[in-house]
Design a protein with these regions (language model features):
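Active-site nucleotide/adenylate-binding loops and adjacent lid/helix of ATP-dependent enzymes
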Residues: 2-10, 14-15, 21, 90-187, ...
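Generic beta-strand structural signal
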Residues: 85, 194-195, 252
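Phosphate-binding site of ATP-dependent enzymes
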Residues: 151-237, 241
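Protein kinase-like catalytic core scaffold
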Residues: 142, 200-201, 246, 258-260
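C-terminal active-site "lid" helix and adjoining low-complexity regulatory extension at the edge
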Residues: 225, 239, 252-294
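Nucleotide-cofactor and metal-assisted catalytic machinery
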Residues: 249
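Short beta->alpha connector loops
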Residues: 66-70, 183-184, 244
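Conserved N-proximal alpha/beta basic substrate-recognition cap immediately N-terminal to
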Residues: 10-122
Length: 294
């Protein structure tokens, strides 16, 4: 019996999360697998007194890891379970600064990026010298982001020194970064889905009310054909990060594309609707190829 697991976060409440797991379960079961969907509070994984990892999940052939809990993913992988995506790929995509560093020096076009200085003393103010460096390097407007976050949260457009000082203070005690604002891409970007190293679908996302184009923030999507240059770039990004599946957000600059973010658990409900591509089926087929048809 082919048996797989879809693991989700116990605190995830958005309908998009349940859609993700139910669609994948549906398509995997069409291929003949028994699929269980578990929240991460529905099993145990721990290190016992002998220093060995124990888990209640040993009966599964694979796990689609729809979570970002890096400790559980590392334990499961060290125990021998095949994860989609793998532990390190999830970690590298979850931290935006790490993503950019991993892609650096590889010919991947990205916005000009500064890592924010991490403050361990909340009462300390961000120095004028730090603000000067950010201003001089990026100019206005610029973008500030927390390194951890999804759905457009903790992403700020900064227009002047006063806003920079305020947001720098807000973010100083958490990992964060500052980036060049790509004005041509304000309120729009391209979401590209890559599965098994190949582009599977793409859509243009746009918003009339926000510089962020996330569907979850009120943006809309439309099907788009992307050129060979962008296809090759996105496939290279997925390869460099060792991703079985991902959604890549691409900014559109006057002189070409810029990779903005890479999402290891990108929602696919919206892109399935606007493109007609059965993303869940493509992902299920990739998993079967990796697990059962080697």
């Amino acid at each position: 019996m082919k048996k797989g697991l879809i693991l989700t976060n116990a605190y995830a409440k958005l309908a998009a999360f349940s859609n993700q797991s139910s669609r994948l379960k549906e398509e995997l079961e069409k291929l003949g697998a028994q699929i269980d969907v578990l929240k991460n509070d529905g099993f145990f994984a721990y290190i016992n007194k002998q220093g060995e990892i124990e888990t209640s999940l040993d009966s599964y052939d694979f796990c689609i890891y729809l979570d970002k809990d890096k400790y559980i993913s590392q334990m499961l992988e060290k125990r021998g379970m095949r994860l989609f995506n793998g532990h390190q790929a999830i970690v590298d995509c979850d931290d935006k600064a790490v993503t950019f560093i991993r892609l650096a020096n590889e010919g991947i076009p990205m916005p000009l990026t500064l890592s924010g200085l991490l403050c361990f003393t909340p009462d300390e103010k961000v120095s004028a010298a730090t603000l000067d460096k950010i201003e001089k390097t990026l100019g206005y407007p610029l973008i500030a982001k927390a390194c951890f976050g999804s759905l457009g949260k903790d992403v700020y457009k900064i227009d002047d020194r006063a806003e920079l000082e305020k947001i720098a203070e807000t973010l100083k005690c958490k990992p964060h970064l500052f980036q060049q604002f790509i004005k041509e891409s304000a309120g729009k970007d391209i979401r590209v889905i890559v599965i098994g190293g190949k582009v599977a679908a793409a859509m243009l996302r746009s918003s009339q009310t926000d510089f962020r184009s996330n569907i979850e923030l009120g943006g809309s999507g439309s099907a788009i054909e992307i050129d060979e240059t962008l296809k090759q770039t996105c496939e290279k990004v997925a390869s460099l990060l060792n991703l079985d599946y991902c959604g890549i957000d691409v900014l559109i600059a006057s002189d070409g594309y810029r990779i903005c973010e890479v999402n290891s658990n990108a929602f696919f409900g919206g892109i399935e609707k606007v493109t007609g591509v059965n993303v869940a089926a493509r992902y299920a087929e990739h998993i079967f190829q990796q697990i059962y048809k080697k």
